[in-house]
């Protein structure tokens, strides 16, 4: 069986370009991906999409939907969205798997672009850092793992 060419990469756990450490980890991950997959298109799943101005396409992450950052730079949990996350994301994923096309009937418009990227990606990778030390009493880790 021939190896499938990696054309589309989705890079997860990109927090904010405003944080120097996060930005350095992102640059390192992008450099490694470009070396290993030079022909690929890379899309970023960003928790603070307004802060990212790089060449790669940046989309609001699932985490950004359940824990958005307001204009003042403060983030707050949207618990209703957190409860809605499971059906809103599982229906498109399972319908893609079973019927070869995603059904977005219950998916809010803000989530659809990132879910479409997940489904279209040949490779999904995560940037290092932030998984264990983020705030949210474990909710951040749960949404990243989901």
Feature annotation, model-predicted:
Residues 2-146:
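Aromatic- and Gly/Pro-rich donor/ligand-binding loops
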